């Protein structure tokens, strides 16, 4: 008879203790509120308010949105121009802790590393953690966080559901949303976003939509960090099954020190695309197969029903992807669906960062990057013609050179550290203890 496995029991007890502690705190807070004098005095007003909510739901929604930060603070948060000194962190600790689910999409681990570099550039103490279970969270958490930042909550709480009961130890709870409003992943994330003290969103329009729903949200564009080496593509392209079709001279093509050091026309790959397969994308590439057959193109559409994990369901790594883009003249951006969106990862981190010119479908607003100044905007129908013009005409290549130079200047002139300082300062101004 096999003896019972008691190795996990202490960890299960830790989780139960955390849940009980949180429930006890909630109960004490509720009891304090029910016994307060203000609660008893406002009982008639609450009854009247409940009646009003039943007969006038539209007015209720208006009341909720009227309290949102739509004034100067929010507007300054979304479009800041002057330098803002960084306020001290709030909470018991003095660090920002960034958390991702280990089983989650590789993109979110990359974003976590970029955000961490931006914080370090700003002189803000921080740590990045990746956990696969509640046991991992409890083992790694050192209770020194003033802010706990959950990246991609739709994934984090899916893989670690017990984290909903994870005590904050007086830290503020922040979340980074990356999902578009029309996706089921956003619906899954919204439940958790409502519990956050602050939500950061890479998309400006999504930050505004969250504010309209009564959620304190700020825009955090994925900007430049000079200390982040994760996206360097200077190394030769790794020889893996996904790249074995590339000639050796392309894989080992030497890169100069700066992405703009060599002329765009000298790069050996004409265009590239990396993305998840969708009916829309597949139809575009199939319809233009003759065009791409005549180009030195690297196109990779992957079908997955699980998060992208390099080395598991993809043989490409971050470095391999960046090395291919670093050797490409054009990086294409095609939306997965008909809903427009600014794909920060593909356009900025995998495009502009490597000195390639990005040709993209029209996107949502994404300060500081502007269409036809920092990337070439073209409809799906016009994209083949624009691509041919850039690659096969001298005027088109000069235009592309001008756009990529402007994009590089925009990228390097706007630091992620500056944005972090602004966010911390704005949150400190708005913060009120709960």
At which residue positions do the language-model features occur?
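Catalytic core of nucleotide-activated saccharide and alditol-phosphate transferases
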Residues: 104, 164-287, 293, 415
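Short, solvent-exposed loop/turn segments at secondary-structure junctions
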Residues: 103-105, 133-135, 153-157, 178-182, ...
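Short boundary motifs at domain starts and secondary-structure transition points
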Residues: 78-97, 137-141, 255-266, 322
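Boundary detector for helix-to-coil junctions that initiate low-complexity/charged tails
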Residues: 1-77
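Glycosyltransferase donor-sugar binding loop
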Residues: 296-311
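Extended catalytic core of nucleotide-activated donor transferases of GT-like folds
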Residues: 80-85, 95-215, 229
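Conserved alpha-helical elements of sugar-nucleotide-dependent glycosyltransferases
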Residues: 12-15, 41-47, 104-115, 280-284, ...
